[in-house]
């Protein structure tokens, strides 16, 4: 059961991050505009660095999740990124900023999924993804897996 759960969660998270990164990689100016839309005071150089590196971080995390390599580090990095995303979208939601989160737009799959790009929808989605990441970390580090030598 654990192997199936690990594979399903890893695949879901991996595909999500891979798609998110690929959707941004060729559009640094749109990503930069999204960074600025959160109205967080950042030096221009840092905002630009985020816009140019974030897609690649998401792609690397997606590939690492899909391949299952370096899972403790991969899960820690995934959780850290999701915590940062959650803090950003939550503050935008709290401040009622009328922005698009600048994240993966799934509205092409179904129009109702456009709500996931609002600050509130993105916050809830990020919390769900963070929960999946925590669940995956618990399953991967479970005593049964350690006792059988699986890691």
How would you describe each model-predicted region?
Residues 1-148:
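Membrane-interfacial helix-loop segments of redox and metal-homeostasis proteins
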């Amino acid at each position: 059961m654990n192997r199936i759960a690990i594979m399903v969660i890893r695949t879901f998270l991996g595909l999500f991050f891979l798609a998110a990164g690929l959707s941004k990689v060729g559009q640094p100016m749109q990503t930069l505009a999204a960074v600025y839309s959160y109205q967080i005071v950042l030096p221009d150089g840092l905002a630009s660095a985020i816009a140019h590196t974030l897609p690649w971080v998401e792609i690397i995390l997606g590939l690492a999740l899909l391949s299952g390599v370096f899972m403790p580090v991969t899960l820690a990095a995934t959780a850290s990124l999701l915590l940062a995303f959650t803090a950003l979208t939550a503050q935008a939601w709290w401040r009622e900023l009328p922005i698009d989160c600048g994240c993966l737009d799934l509205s092409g799959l179904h129009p109702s999924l456009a709500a996931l790009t609002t600050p509130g929808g993105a916050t809830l989605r990020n919390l769900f993804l963070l929960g999946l990441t925590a669940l995956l970390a618990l399953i991967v580090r479970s005593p049964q897996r350690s006792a059988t030598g699986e890691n």
